[in-house]
From Swiss-Prot:
It catalyses: 1-(5-phospho-beta-D-ribosyl)-ATP + H2O = 1-(5-phospho-beta-D-ribosyl)-5'-AMP + diphosphate + H(+). Its EC number is 3.6.1.31. Pathway: Amino-acid biosynthesis; L-histidine biosynthesis; L-histidine from 5-phospho-alpha-D-ribose 1-diphosphate: step 2/9. Belongs to the PRA-PH family. It holds the Pfam family PRA-PH. GO terms for biological process: L-histidine biosynthetic process. This is Phosphoribosyl-ATP pyrophosphatase. It is an enzyme of class 3 (hydrolase). It is found in: Cytoplasm. Signal peptide: none annotated. Keywords: Amino-acid biosynthesis, ATP-binding, Cytoplasm, Histidine biosynthesis, Hydrolase, Nucleotide-binding.
Amino acid sequence: MDALKEVYSTIEKRIKEKPEGSYVVKLTTNDKKTAVNKICEKIGEEAAETILAAKDNDKSEIIYESADLIFHTFVLLAKFGISYEELNEEFKKRMK
């Protein structure tokens, strides 16, 4: 399994099983509106940090912040019940 798919599966599992102390659980367990707001705030924060890293031309920081951005985007998608396969299919459509 590739790393991105494995991370996505772990996020889905944590949303479903709600293990104590999980960061994903902390982001996703409030009422849906509050949870979505928290996740969107994190996405905005990570997007800004990715932009700043790019402006600083710092490759390692771009990679680090991009991973955070992708992770939080995955949390949002999983919160809405969107599967990794659905996301993958959207990318396949765009390759045509």
